[in-house]
Amino acid sequence: MNKTLLKSVREYKKQSVLAPFFVILEVLMEVLIPMEMAKIIDVGIMQGNLSYIVRRGLILVIMAMLALYFGIIAGKMAAIAGAGYAKNLRHDIFYKVQEFSFKNIDRFSTSGLVTRMTTDITNVQMAYMMSIRLLARAPIMIVLSWIMTLLLNKKIALLFLIIIPLLGGTLIFIAKKAHPHFIKVFDEYDILNNSVQENVNASRVVKAFVREDHEIEKFHGISKYVYTLFTKAEKIVAWNSPVMQFTIYTAMLLMVAIGGREIVFGAMEIGEMTSVIVYAFQIMMALMMVTFVFVMIMIAEASTDRITEVLAEVPEMQDKKNAITEVADGEIRFEHVDFSYAGEGGNLSLKDVNLHIKSGQTIGIIGGTGSSKSTLVQLIPRLYDVTKGTVKVGGLDVREYNLEALRDQVSMVLQKNVLFTGTIYDNIRWGNEHASEEEVQRVCKLAQADGFIKEFPAGYHTMIVQVGNNVSGGQKQRLCIARALLKKPKILILDDSTSAVDTKTDALIRKAFREEIPDTTKIIIAQRVSSIENADQIIVLDEGKIMGVGTSEELLATNEIYREVYESQIKGGEDDE
């Protein structure tokens, strides 16, 4: 375990310390028991002293009961510490991801993050729980048992002094060989989980194109590769068992030979030899524990590296010390803005963008696929930082604002509409968790969603399931618009968010915006000219450059790109009629 991950122990430090403490007490009792057995055999049984046998036998039972009690307490403490540590680790990863910018998130796949928070954390939890118990138990058991063996017979003790380092070195060698293979296994788990996620999310597309067999074959290929990698790792780890067994049998054979000779020549009593055999088993069992924990640690090390990648990731965007917490108005300025997703030196998605949007204006943005319309608006709430230049909101550079304060005043309905499991009411209240039912209904009326919501038997308490699969695309878009409106933002951005809505409903939404939220700056990205035709200004984008700004009439007269789009849609529609 590295220091980054150990910080997550926090309030479970007490249990993490108590577990090995009780393990030490348990081991002390277990180590003293064979010594008592030797006395019972050599003094009690061999001399026929019944009272001595009873007296020492009672002490033996008490020791055994104490060992059992300490073992139970140690197990309980280790379980609490392990489960608590895993809980904190999950929280830490989840909280860290919440701090990430889009650029940070782009470095990790969704399935990779899910695997880290489930499989990887479970591996680390098991290794931690085993470590604080067995890694405390095994070394102490080996040392104390060896000391007791040394007191009974120096020759046999010397035998173990040779065997233990040899075995330990072999186990470490096996662990180092297996570790890289386990890393590959868990990286491949990400791909496997991603395949499952894609298939489930796109199940309707898969069935529509009758691609079930193709998906099964693809999944089988990935699954088989995971199996191959895991088998390679396990084949290396499998050497632990034969190495351990060979060591145990060799040690026992040598020990019996040495011990038998010592008894024959009167250097040892039978009871002492019995104790030495018990101590030998204790040492061997401790070594087997180390082997078992080593396997767990090997797996956990690969998981630890992957978890640390997330926790060590530095958020691209952080608030300044005296960040501004209030946005004055919805005025927006782009001043010589360049942007690249790859950062400095990468291919530019936006090139020398200069733009001024007055507070309260309705702005339309139009352009072909790949013209960076979405990229442009994502810079306003600072979902990404500019590569060069400045984006200003309310007269200030967006980097001067507290991120939460800025994004609270910039509502954005993204291209991919996302609804969460819960009622319609709960989904809308994502925009403002303290909103009343009246406020929720008001924004739903503005978004033209109130009508279809009331047609559901449960109305606003209708459950949304599986990211909104029980509502249509147009209904989903209107619910997302209502959610954005509930924030009462100074800037509202609709990124092609009415594409699944019919033209009549689209017109009603725009009319409601004009009448009900005139002071809010409204930016509408659309493929339909009719959705932005009446905007105060229309921005024409092409390959990351602004090719024209003006009203629809002005652009028809001066901008060839806009004129072609307009004529293809408006005149094309007339021809269809």
Name these PLM-found stretches:
Residues 1-30, 37, 45-60, 74-78, ...:
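Membrane-integrated ABC transporters
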Residues 21-22, 29-38, 42, 50, ...:
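Juxtamembrane helix-loop junctions of ABC transporter transmembrane domains
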Residues 49-55, 144, 148-162, 232-306, ...:
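Helix-loop-helix
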Residues 47-48, 83, 91-115, 119-121, ...:
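Short intracellular "coupling" helices and adjacent cytoplasmic loop segments at the cytosolic face
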Residues 326-577:
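ABC-type nucleotide-binding domain
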Residues 11, 15-28, 39, 59-63, ...:
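Transmembrane helices of ABC transporter permease
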Residues 20, 24-32, 65-72, 124-127, ...:
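Hydrophobic alpha-helical transmembrane bundles that constitute the permease/transmembrane domains
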Residues 11-13, 99-103, 119-132, 136, ...:
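An intracellular "coupling" helix at the cytosolic face of ABC transporter transmembrane type-1 domains
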